[in-house]
A protein has these predicted regions:
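Conserved anion-binding
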Residues: 1-49, 56-60
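Short flexible/disordered coil segments
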Residues: 4-7, 55-66, 89-93, 109-114
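Electropositive phosphate-/nucleotide-binding environments in soluble metabolic enzymes
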Residues: 8, 12, 34, 68, ...
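Glycine- and other small-residue-rich loops at beta-strand/loop junctions that grip anionic moieties
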Residues: 29-30, 63, 85-87
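Catalytic cores of alpha/beta
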Residues: 38-40, 59-80, 96-101
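Residue-level detector of anion-binding/catalytic polar loops
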Residues: 49, 80-81
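Generic beta-sheet signal
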Residues: 51-53, 85
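C-terminal helical cap(s) of enzyme catalytic domains, especially alpha/beta-barrels
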Residues: 75-77, 86-114
């Protein structure tokens, strides 16, 4: 989200420590910033998972300043799992919405692993 207190030096140190620790199996990436996800994937390699909130089929800004990116783009950029909240629970048909997110993420995975 905009205005967070993280800075690049802090983020790098946290990621480097996590990569080096066998007990860390993954990281949370930013779904609204595919370039940052790709950089995180390049840093952590394929041995760690990346879980990604901040995705929505309706790409854009949320009502509380959060940003949403495309779920397919998130997976193409290196995410292993998308985390979806309001895109499903606020949908008129949550089951259909969940299926749409599954389809979008699966599409990204097939394209990524081509």
């Amino acid at each position: 989200s905009r205005g967070n207190l993280l800075h690049p030096g802090y983020t790098k140190e946290v990621v480097d420590n996590g990569v080096a620790h066998d007990g860390v199996f993954g990281f949370i990436g930013n779904g609204s910033r595919p370039a940052e996800l790709a950089a995180l994937r390049a840093t952590v390699g394929e041995g760690k998972m990346i879980w990604t909130p901040g995705v929505n089929l309706a790409v854009g800004d949320g009502e509380m300043g959060q940003r949403y990116g495309d779920p397919t783009a998130a997976v193409l950029s290196g995410s292993d799992c998308i985390i979806v909240g309001s895109g499903i629970h606020k949908a008129d048909d949550p089951r259909a919405a969940a299926a749409a997110y599954a389809e979008a993420s699966w599409k990204g995975l097939l394209q990524r692993n081509g």
